[in-house]
């Protein structure tokens, strides 16, 4: 046997080493020359052992697998049996290994593509935004305080109230048909906030548990937020939402509501 020169590259596992040997030999992965690849693989393992490198057990398991496949390939093939009712085709001992290598190659190529994209992205540098707080008006500063509260946060809080109402209501109840005005409820909310020193929790505005009243209250709150009469704050996710009353526009809203 000619001496085999092994270059000690870094491989991530036995499949990585096998794929390297197949590519190096320029052979078809669907028709692996087991004898050649096994010889090169074993030479690589022996070289690692001679250099007293730690050989992981998974490499030795693959070596045993290759030797087993090689021995099966050396066995004389059984004659194919054909008749009208039965057809026998001998299984290729390389098939399972071939599928594992194809799957591994697919993941390896995908990982390489992601690595290249990461390299391209690392060449893009962004700068931090300038701090423009000094140029904000007082009203804009107040608006910044609601940046953590979105319509989705409000809807989530409202859905939570509906669930509590569903659990707390009696199994049988009398349905009362009542009409609620959004304008009137807007005025009521502003008055409630004034009584509470200008702030209260979201759920505290839903004192009545009737479905109609809850819907009107929620819509009135959205209208008040739209007109900047109130604003909301939430210190962290899933924490209570606090409603704050703004000064200035509230009187105009109250007068407009009372005129309807």
Curated annotation (Swiss-Prot):
Gene from which the chain derives: scpA
Main localization (coarse): cytoplasm
Family: Belongs to the ScpA family.
Keyword Lipoprotein: no
Oligomeric and partner information: Component of a cohesin-like complex composed of ScpA, ScpB and the Smc homodimer, in which ScpA and ScpB bind to the head domain of Smc. The presence of the three proteins is required for the association of the complex with DNA.
Keywords linked to the UniProt accession: Cell cycle, Cell division, Chromosome partition, Cytoplasm
Gene Ontology annotations for the cellular component aspect, listed alphabetically: cytoplasm
GO biological process per UniProt: cell division; chromosome segregation; DNA replication
Record lineage: Bacteria, Bacillati, Bacillota, Bacilli, Bacillales
Annotated source species: Halalkalibacterium halodurans (strain ATCC BAA-125 / DSM 18197 / FERM 7344 / JCM 9153 / C-125) (Bacillus halodurans)
Domain of life of the source: Bacteria
HAMAP family: ScpA
Keyword Transcription regulation: no
Pfam families xref list: SMC_ScpA (PF02616)
Compartment(s): Cytoplasm
InterPro entries: ScpA (IPR003768), ScpA-like_C (IPR023093)
Cleaved signal peptide residues: none
Protein function: Participates in chromosomal partition during cell division. May act via the formation of a condensin-like complex containing Smc and ScpB that pull DNA away from mid-cell into both cell halves.
Protein name (database record): Segregation and condensation protein A
């Amino acid at each position: 046997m000619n001496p085999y020169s092994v270059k000690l590259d870094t491989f991530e596992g036995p499949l990585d080493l096998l794929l390297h040997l197949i590519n190096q030999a320029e052979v078809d992965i669907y028709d692996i020359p087991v004898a050649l690849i096994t010889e090169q693989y074993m030479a690589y393992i022996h070289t690692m052992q001679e250099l007293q490198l730690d050989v992981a057990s998974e490499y030795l398991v693959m070596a045993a697998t290759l030797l087993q496949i090689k021995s099966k390939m050396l066995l004389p093939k059984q004659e194919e049996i054909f008749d009208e009712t039965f057809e026998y085709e001998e299984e290729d001992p390389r098939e399972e290994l071939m599928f594992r290598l194809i799957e591994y190659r697919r993941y390896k190529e995908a990982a390489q593509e992601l690595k290249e994209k990461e390299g391209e992205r690392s060449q893009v540098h962004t700068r931090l935004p300038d701090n423009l707080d000094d140029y904000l008006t007082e009203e804009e500063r107040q608006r910044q305080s609601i940046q953590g509260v979105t319509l989705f946060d409000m809807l989530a809080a409202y859905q939570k109230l509906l669930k509590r109402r569903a659990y707390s209501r009696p199994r049988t109840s009398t349905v009362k048909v009542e009409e609620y005005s959004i304008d009137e409820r807007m005025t009521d909310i502003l008055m409630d906030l004034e009584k509470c020193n200008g702030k209260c929790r979201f759920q505290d505005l839903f004192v009545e548990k009737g479905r109609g009243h809850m819907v009107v209250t929620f819509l009135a709150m959205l209208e008040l937020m739209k007109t900047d009469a109130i604003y909301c704050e939430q210190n962290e996710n899933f924490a209570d939402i606090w409603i704050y009353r703004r000064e200035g526009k509230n009187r105009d809203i109250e007068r407009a509501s009372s005129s309807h």
